[in-house]
Amino acid sequence: MSAKFGPAGNSEAFSAKYKTTLQAPGYLEAMGLDHYEYQCGRGVKVSDKIAFALKDKAKEHNITLSLHAPYFISLSSLEAEKRDNSINYILQSCDAASRMGADRIVIHSGSCAKISREDALELAKDTLTRARKTAVEQGFEHIVFCPETMGKVNQLGNLTEVLELCKLDDTFLPTIDFGHLNAREFGYIKGKAEYEKMLDEVENAVSYTHLRAHETSQDLV
């Protein structure tokens, strides 16, 4: 399997020398990297001008793109309105990703609220299924959904839960943030054996994935 490497957002080193994200593709190519994750964690606010320009720059410098959907998505909220809003945030992310030429969006699942993890997972499955159905209806069938592992115990998103979400649709792929998994398991990762165990679990569930090495702020696609 081929791999692509690149940052999620702009590093301090980049920001110290450059003024705009549109310069990121050239910067990454010069460093020997080939992927960039555009950050919409605080909301999807991407104009056509920026989206189309980034698409052109990424193509010029052989950089593939993904997009991180808003952090405030809550797939398993007890409030139906919040789940519906989460679907809208996902659709907004699909639209922005499509305009800039990205082929996948990274999705946080949110907290388990005051219900069991099993019930939260079922709500999340329903929300993601409805989001995918609407995305396809709106012409975003080419956008891959990538649920991400979460870093806090009260959040839905341990490795098993993320893999369960990805079984909903062939176009769903897990985003595995090892830093998050290590945090939620209180320093579980000690070395190679723990990584191998987690990767074996992923391999048994899906054949292709989106991995994030949290410590270096790099993505492995």
Language-model regions, residue ranges each:
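N-terminal pre-domain/capping segments
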Residues: 1-95
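Active-site glycine- and acidic-residue-rich loops that bind
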Residues: 150-161, 183-199
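Well-ordered, non-membrane alpha-helical segments in soluble/globular domains
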Residues: 21, 124-128, 192-199
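Hydrophobic faces of well-ordered beta-strands that scaffold small-molecule active sites
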Residues: 5-9, 36-38, 65-67, 105-107, ...
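Conserved small/polar residues in nucleotide/adenosyl-binding loops
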Residues: 209-216
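Active-site beta-loop-alpha junctions enriched in small/polar residues
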Residues: 8-12, 39-43, 70-72, 110-112, ...
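Active-site acidic/histidine proton-transfer and metal-coordination neighborhood
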Residues: 59, 76-175
